[in-house]
C-alpha cells in the first residue's frame, strides 16, 4: 500500500511539474505587471474600508482606520518597481500616458506617497472621521 501511495504521489508530482514547465516562465515584463497589480489590489483592499468610514457607510473605528492608513502609506512606496520598461503587456489597466511621460508619473507617485504618509500620521491621533476626511480626499485625488 505504501508503495502504491508513493507511486501515485510521484505521478502527480511529475504531472504538475510537466504542466508548470509547459506553461513557460513569465517574462520580466509579465512579472512586473503581476507585481504592480498585486500591490494595487492590496492598496485598494485597505483603502476601501477607509472610504466606507469616510462616507459613513460603516462605523468609524479609529484603530482600524489608522492601521489601514499606515498600510497604504507603506504600500504607496512599492508600485513604481512594477513599471519597468516594456511592461505594457497582457491585461493591464495602466494608462499609456505612464510610459509616454514616466517623469510625470513618478512625480504623481511621490505625491501619492507624501499624501498617504500625511494621512497615516493624522490617523494616529484622530478620534473622529471628520478630522481625516480632507487628507483622505487628498490621498484619493493623488491616486488617480
State what each model feature region is:
Residues 15-19:
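N-terminal signal peptide c-region/cleavage motif recognized by signal peptidases
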Residues 1-9:
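Bacterial N-terminal signal peptides that target proteins for export
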Residues 11-13:
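Repetitive helical segments and hydrophobic/amphipathic motifs
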Residues 20-24:
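Boundary at the C-terminal end of the N-terminal hydrophobic targeting segment
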Residues 26, 30-62, 68-144:
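Sequence context surrounding c-type heme c attachment/ligation sites in exported
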Amino acid at each position: 500500500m505504501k508503495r502504491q501511495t508513493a507511486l501515485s504521489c510521484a505521478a502527480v508530482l511529475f504531472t504538475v511539474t510537466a504542466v508548470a514547465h509547459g506553461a513557460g516562465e513569465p517574462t520580466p515584463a509579465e512579472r512586473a505587471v503581476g507585481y504592480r497589480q498585486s500591490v494595487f489590489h492590496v492598496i485598494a483592499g485597505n483603502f476601501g474600508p477607509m472610504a466606507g468610514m469616510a462616507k459613513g457607510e460603516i462605523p468609524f473605528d479609529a484603530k482600524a482606520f489608522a492601521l489601514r492608513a499606515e498600510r497604504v502609506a507603506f504600500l504607496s512606496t512599492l508600485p513604481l518597481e512594477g513599471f519597468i520598461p516594456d511592461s505594457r503587456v497582457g491585461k493591464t489597466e495602466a494608462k499609456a500616458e505612464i510610459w509616454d511621460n514616466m517623469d510625470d508619473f513618478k512625480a504623481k507617485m511621490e505625491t501619492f506617497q507624501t499624501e498617504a504618509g500625511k494621512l497615516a500620521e493624522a490617523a494616529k491621533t484622530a478620534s473622529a472621521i471628520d478630522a481625516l476626511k480632507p487628507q483622505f480626499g487628498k490621498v484619493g485625488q493623488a491616486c488617480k
